[in-house]
Amino acid sequence: MPRPPWSDRHAQIHRGLRVRPLLPPGCGVVVAVSGGQDSVALLRLLVDLQPKWHWRLWAVHCDHGWRPDSAENAAFVADLCQSWGVPCQVIAAETRPTTEADARQWRYEALGDVAQTLGATHIATGHTATDRAETLLYNLLRGSGTDGLQALAWQRSLSPAQPGLTVVRPLLDLTRQDTAQFCQQFNLPVWIDSTNADLTYARNRLRLEVFPLLQRHFNPRVDQTLAQTAEILTAEVALLDQMTEELYAKTVQPQDLSWVIQRSVLRSAPLALQRRVLRRVLQRVMTAPVSFDHGEKLVALMAAPNRSQTDPFPGGWLARVEADQIRLMPKADG
């Protein structure tokens, strides 16, 4: 059997996986393959590294049915995987997703279902440093705290319902330019997705209009710079999460049909931790995403006089000061 090809990129990913053990030796890995340059580069790298790591590899292509050529795209991926000796499944959406968010949720659910059926423990995606930078900037422009700005961690649990499945992103040290060069170096076939040029999608406008401007006029390595910022924030958010968890346990208790917050204990903590604890309480009761303004309504009650209260939050709950406590409770009918 001929030896797999080797390059600086192979060595980089191999070293990275030894330092950051995203894919343990011998584990089962479902690789998400769209056919674009990032996922093709990822699959080729994992196939070439497989003799060193002894992974069990499967490829999965998710067909949203959004484009007239989606069936051709799926066939392209299936043929590519067959030529590389990788078992491949094509999953077609029974109901076409209507938004990018819906499509993303469906993809991960489909990947998780296949992984569980096959006995895989990991799902690998081709996200790069460029994706990480775009996600950070996108979340910043929409309005986000540090949780949103950490953007695409190296690994995460797929979902609380599937705790045994881990999503990993082995290419976060590479940019989109790096994966393009890798595909060119090894003459890898790549499927060109026509929707990537559609400027009705916000992320495409960032990719095609905003980032080129930032690279020309501010920083030619802006994607790497923002990705590094996301990496720093990821570590800091992990610390904040731990501190928040400890403070939450000391200051928040369920009581009958309400949640009670101990003001004096929480007030002694830094404002950043107060906000995170109060946001976590609101996430338990609100039917809409918790905005900055929602959180600040609770923050204002930390020093408010007795019997002060908020307007109802989405979902019908309101907060009221009761001596040294804040009680979050359903709004009484009438």
Predicted features along the sequence, with ranges:
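Core alpha/beta nucleotide-donor-binding catalytic domains of modification enzymes
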Residues: 1-208
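AMP-forming adenylation/ATP pyrophosphatase catalytic core
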Residues: 2-38, 58, 62-64, 93-95, ...
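Secondary-structure boundary/capping positions in well-ordered alpha/beta enzyme cores
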Residues: 53, 121, 221, 285-289
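Contiguous mid-protein beta-loop-alpha structural module that forms a pocket-lining wall or clamp
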Residues: 173-245, 249
